[in-house]
């Protein structure tokens, strides 16, 4: 390699990067806690503004955090350029940092809530832009970074912003992590979400249990039947991620609900799988089963 070529290779400080990642990780950001997510949005916006990036912050709604867009301090903003996409929320609740997911380093591996998905990647986008400015470098195309606050629950409030930004871009780089062995992710499974409501009949558990129709018992049977749709061999998965029901310990439960997650890879008839989730005859004819939802993101 010539000296000229070597001089064009950027130099990065690994410890500086890790310190920045840790700073982001230690601000806990569960998707449904908009106030918590916005604490990190504040930090990111401040860091990007400091290097001259133009930031636009769109207030969140429905309890979610704000959407943050940052444009590099160069290039024509109207020219199709490079969009870097990341999310700032995680699946972990407040308190995970102090209990189940304490930040720690073991050799070359670092652990913490959301560090893999995807605070490390999101931070690297910010760091790269900072590094370009610090080194006096520019890309040929304009660069914008879009950080969303609720990707882990399907981007219900930021989807329109993502699609609009993507349409204006020539290239899109998503900062999600690689897979085992450093494999690059180039596609995603289709993703669907469904809500199930089961209505039974309440009765006193002590004096008249025979008069009741347990919505929870029906839910248990439905849960097993739903998850039997999963086929690991082809990559189809159906997971009942949340379930609840009942009103009191001494009452046969008249109501139960569940939230269902569906993943379908390319090449699979997603509509057929969706119908198997939606069409739910009751095991107990005295219970009513209702399912709503569908595919949120196609494969």
Report the location of each language-model feature.
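Acidic/His- and Gly-rich active-site-bordering loop/insert found
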Residues: 2-113, 134-139
